[in-house]
A protein has these predicted regions:
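Extended C-terminal subregions enriched in glycine
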Residues: 46, 116, 164, 197, ...
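Alpha-helical support elements that line or immediately flank enzyme active sites
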Residues: 187-209
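Glycine-rich phosphate/pyrophosphate-binding beta-alpha loops
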Residues: 14-22, 108-111, 123-134, 187-193
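Short glycine-rich loop/turn motifs
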Residues: 2-3, 25, 105-110, 119, ...
Length: 251
């Protein structure tokens, strides 16, 4: 497939296209690049990151489908004009966007590189538990159950049809700058993946952390509505101030 990308502060961020949800990470970054940030774990930074991710997911859950059936085009979703429109919605209080309810997954991500400059960003998941439970006779290959990503709402671009690809969450990423490879990136966890991409990339680009530190930094995850999960490594005062901004924070 042909990956989709945006430019974020001089870096080209590459993600898997629809029917995967890598585009939600790109939409969030497109919104966030219009802000200045005062620190990695500050209340203002976390609030803006969470709100941008919520807006991106609201669009993603509405529009992502098999690209042959998408009535809203990727180019429109990633346009600077649309990012500015969505950015203007972010205020001092937590939003309540319309979006589907995320749920947990079981995914493996790995990346590798060699001394010749070859790099691989790889992810694998059968989706729920053991996937479909259907195994290829004689080979032991277990088929996935990604068909669960279809919508049964006939008005949805992601409505279930024969020979159609469902919305899915498998999105290995890649980062380049000025046409040169910087490196692969990715995280695990279904709907956490684009949220993790945004946080790891901002840790690297905005806050100048090395790759290990960018991955090790504490993370948040938007769940649904105003509910946000934060790792307990965030400062207690940051957690309390986010609650005052209207976020339903669970630690």
């Amino acid at each position: 497939v042909e990956p989709v990308h945006i430019n974020y502060r001089g870096y080209d961020v590459w993600e898997m296209p629809p029917n995967g949800h890598g585009i939600t990470a790109l939409m969030a970054l497109n919104i966030l690049k219009g802000f200045d940030f005062d620190g990695r774990d500050s209340v203002a930074t976390l609030h803006k990151q969470i709100e941008a991710m919520k807006l991106a997911f609201a669009d993603g859950m509405q529009y992502i489908a098999d690209p042959r059936y998408m009535r809203t085009k990727v180019e429109a979703m990633l346009s600077e004009e649309y990012a500015a429109e969505r950015r203007a919605l972010i205020g001092e209080q937590a939003l309540l966007p319309e979006a589907g309810k995320p749920f947990c997954g079981g995914t493996v991500y790995l990346c590798t590189a060699d001394n010749e400059g070859n790099m691989v960003s790889f992810i694998q998941s059968n989706y729920k538990d053991f996937g479909s439970g259907v195994v290829l006779p004689g080979y032991g290959i277990n088929f996935n159950d990604r068909g669960a990503g279809f919508s049964l709402d006939e008005s949805s671009d992601d409505f279930l049809l024969p020979r159609k690809k469902p919305y899915h969450t498998i999105i290995p990423g890649f980062l380049t700058k000025d046409g040169e490879a910087v490196g692969p990136f990715g995280v695990m966890g279904a709907y956490m993946q684009p949220q993790g991409h945004v946080q790891v990339l901002m840790n690297t680009i905005d806050f100048l952390l090395n790759p290990q530190a960018a991955l090790d930094a504490p993370r948040w995850q938007w769940i649904d509505g105003r509910e946000v999960w934060l790792e307990d490594r965030f400062a207690p005062e940051v957690i309390e101030q986010l609650r005052k901004l209207g976020h339903d924070v669970r630690v």
